[in-house]
Amino acid sequence: MSKPVLSTGLRWLWLVLVVIAIDFVSKQWIMNNLMLHESMPVMPFFNFFYAHNYGAAFSFLADKGGWQRWFFAGIAVAIVVVLLVMMYRSKASDRLNNIAYALIVGGALGNLFDRAYHGFVVDFIDFTIGDWHFATFNIADCGICIGAALIVLEGFINPTSKRSEHKG
């Protein structure tokens, strides 16, 4: 009993491709225009800074000898599969959740490509204010974080409708 793909959340797969494309093009531009660890000021508080991240967010487990590359790749594959199944099971009209899932899938695949091809993730978005410095990140990370925030927002907007759907 298959259903038409366009009636499911998979209708939002175009957004996955947009995130992957912007992430890929931006990382290619950074790798072609900056040397590793080179900084390019954009604004007083915002720089492009070319970095290799061998770990996860905030360089978690970056110095653990290489096994983390495949560990985080496996986590990314699992998350992508779960979210694609969730998108298939949801209605295309469930916009907020499907947009959130698509952003996360696009971000996960963008970073997965880096891990598989380079052995590290290319990070380059760098914010500093005075002595405060935020961890360097990339467009894929933005997709993941915005998607996660949208899932939380959906929980606040429709907390009871989701619970009743799962009960009945």
From Swiss-Prot:
It catalyses: Release of signal peptides from bacterial membrane prolipoproteins. Hydrolyzes -Xaa-Yaa-Zaa-|-(S,diacylglyceryl)Cys-, in which Xaa is hydrophobic (preferably Leu), and Yaa (Ala or Ser) and Zaa (Gly or Ala) have small, neutral side chains. It is an enzyme of class 3 (hydrolase). Its main location: membrane. It is found in: Cell inner membrane. Pfam families: Peptidase_A8. Coiled coil: none annotated. The active site is at D123, D141. One of its GO terms (molecular function) is aspartic-type endopeptidase activity. One of its GO terms (cellular component) is plasma membrane. The keyword Transferase does not apply. Belongs to the peptidase A8 family. This is Lipoprotein signal peptidase. It comes from Erwinia tasmaniensis (strain DSM 17950 / CFBP 7177 / CIP 109463 / NCPPB 4357 / Et1/99).
